Amino acid sequence: MGSEVCRVFLIGGRASGKSTVGRALAARLGWDFADTDAMVTRRAGCDIATLVAERGWDAFRDMESDALRDAAARERVVVATGGGMVLRAENRALLREAGVTVFLSLPVEVVAARLARNPEHGQRPSLTGKAVADEVADVMRERAPLYAEAARHVVRGDAPVACIVEDITALLAFS
């Protein structure tokens, strides 16, 4: 692994596997793991749906940015970010500058199927009010250029977790 790498950020849409891959990658590297959504819910004292309903999206995004800054201040950490972390320019800049950022890219159909199978993901507030597959397609179309701007590497997120971890580990060796 490149000697300057001390943080890995995982970005991508909802249900792209950021937390699952992040935990496995952190274990492989012997590093800590941080999840910005978990940091936000811990600080807010409620789940994200409640936070957004009571305080609004701007308050959530502010707390999300704070969580990213806190995670970026740590060393030897793999950070799973919320799907909308890239919406703010300052977050994209921090992701580029503070470590190696990997975009877990998935086909819309795979994300929609994961969301349909996992009730926990269904607890997140809808961004558009549309059907899951339509919302995923719209959100990914909007965010794809932002993920590309923030990421140093793109990895297919629909492979087995162990394969994704191997792919990222190999990329880190050259970062």
UniProtKB/Swiss-Prot annotation:
<dbReference type="GO" id="GO:0009423">
    <property type="term" value="P:chorismate biosynthetic process"/>
</dbReference>
<dbReference type="InterPro" id="IPR023000">
    <property type="entry name" value="Shikimate_kinase_CS"/>
</dbReference>
<dbReference type="InterPro" id="IPR031322">
    <property type="entry name" value="Shikimate/glucono_kinase"/>
</dbReference>
<keyword id="KW-0028">Amino-acid biosynthesis</keyword>
<keyword id="KW-0963">Cytoplasm</keyword>
<keyword id="KW-0067">ATP-binding</keyword>
<comment type="similarity">
    <text>Belongs to the shikimate kinase family.</text>
</comment>
<keyword id="KW-0418">Kinase</keyword>
<feature type="binding site">
    <location>
        <begin position="12"/>
        <end position="19"/>
    </location>
    <ligand>
        <name>ATP</name>
    </ligand>
</feature>
<dbReference type="InterPro" id="IPR027417">
    <property type="entry name" value="P-loop_NTPase"/>
</dbReference>
<dbReference type="GO" id="GO:0005524">
    <property type="term" value="F:ATP binding"/>
</dbReference>
<comment type="pathway">
    <text>Metabolic intermediate biosynthesis; chorismate biosynthesis; chorismate from D-erythrose 4-phosphate and phosphoenolpyruvate: step 5/7.</text>
</comment>
<protein>
    <recommendedName>
        <fullName>Shikimate kinase</fullName>
        <ecNumber>2.7.1.71</ecNumber>
    </recommendedName>
</protein>
<keyword id="KW-0057">Aromatic amino acid biosynthesis</keyword>
<dbReference type="Pfam" id="PF01202">
    <property type="entry name" value="SKI"/>
</dbReference>
<keyword id="KW-0808">Transferase</keyword>
<dbReference type="GO" id="GO:0004765">
    <property type="term" value="F:shikimate kinase activity"/>
</dbReference>
<dbReference type="GO" id="GO:0000287">
    <property type="term" value="F:magnesium ion binding"/>
</dbReference>
<dbReference type="InterPro" id="IPR000623">
    <property type="entry name" value="Shikimate_kinase/TSH1"/>
</dbReference>
<dbReference type="GO" id="GO:0008652">
    <property type="term" value="P:amino acid biosynthetic process"/>
</dbReference>
<keyword id="KW-0547">Nucleotide-binding</keyword>
<dbReference type="GO" id="GO:0005829">
    <property type="term" value="C:cytosol"/>
</dbReference>
<dbReference type="GO" id="GO:0009073">
    <property type="term" value="P:aromatic amino acid family biosynthetic process"/>
</dbReference>
